[in-house]
Amino acid sequence: MGIEQVIDRYCEAWSTKERAKRAEIVNEVWAESGTYSDPRSDVRGREALVGLIDAANVQFPPGIEIKRTSAVDAHHNVARFAWALSGEGISMEGIDIAFLSDDGTRLERVIGFFGPLAPEA
């Protein structure tokens, strides 16, 4: 699986409603002790990530999707990509920075940013 496929599967985990399927995807693409942080969260490990996604899915209306909206820009097993969350009555965009394992098959760290960058003042 290439870097783009790993990232797309990771985004799919956020959109998946079934916990068992979500956990399966996370186990496939997430390093055992991988970390995720964004302005609201900071978790370590697969189970913690699944729990975070569980909590997020409770807050969002049914049918939300998170999809990658840019090409994956990557070098030296570090990647950045834009994403968008959309669904009934909600939309959000952001950028994630992802650090991958040496073989490029698992995410070891993801740092998420919400919203577009503000122009320089």
Residue ranges and their predicted role:
Residues 21-76:
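A solvent-exposed, acidic/Ser-Thr-rich amphipathic alpha-helical stretch
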Residues 1-29:
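Short acidic-aromatic low-complexity motifs
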Residues 54-121:
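A beta-strand edge to alpha-helix "cap/lid" segment located at domain peripheries
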Residues 10, 30, 36, 81-83, ...:
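Aromatic side chains
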